[in-house]
Amino acid sequence: MAHHIPPLNFGMVADDLYRSGQPNELNFPFLEKLQLKKIIFLAPDDPSQQFQNFVEDQDIELIHLGMDTHQNPWNPISEEIVISALKIILNPDNYPLHIMCNLGRHRTGTVVGCLRKLQRWNLTSIFEEYRRFAGSKVKLLNEQFIELFDTDLVTYNNAPQWLYLS
C-alpha cells in the first residue's frame, strides 16, 4: 500500500489550486492523487532530477519561473515573476495547478499573498496566512511587497469562479 505524504508546507489555496515546497519521492504518490495539469516552480535553482522525472512521467507541464539570476536572494520575488505566476493561476485551463518553491514559504507565500489581494482579502488575513507557512522565518520585505502590490497590473478575462466569491 502506497503512503500518501504531502510535501512540506502543503496547503490548498482554492479548488484545484495547491501550494507547497519542492516534493521528494515520498510525496509523489500523494501528488499523483491530485491529477495535476501544471506546476509553477518559483525557485531560482532547477528542480531536482527526481522531481523532473516524476513530472515528465505524469505528463504534468512544469513552468519554471524562478528568480532573476542577478537579484539578491534576500530581496522579495520580482513583480514581473509574480504577475507571470498570477496570470497562469487565473487561467482555469491550467487546473488542477500547484505552486511551489524550495520550501513553500517565501516565494510561494508572496505569490499567494498577492492572489489573496486580488481576492480582496484584508491584509491581516493575508499576513496571517503568509506567517503560518513562513513560521519563524517571516520576511518583512515580502509582507511589504504584498501590501504595496498593485493588483491593477494583473489582467485576466476568464478567471476561476472562486476568485469572485471572496
UniProtKB/Swiss-Prot annotation:
It is found in: Cytoplasm. The active site is at C101 (phosphocysteine intermediate). Its EC number is 3.1.3.48. The keyword Hydrolase applies. Keywords: Cytoplasm, Hydrolase, Protein phosphatase. This is Probable tyrosine-protein phosphatase DG1060. The gene is DG1060. It catalyses: O-phospho-L-tyrosyl-[protein] + H2O = L-tyrosyl-[protein] + phosphate. Transmembrane segments: none annotated.
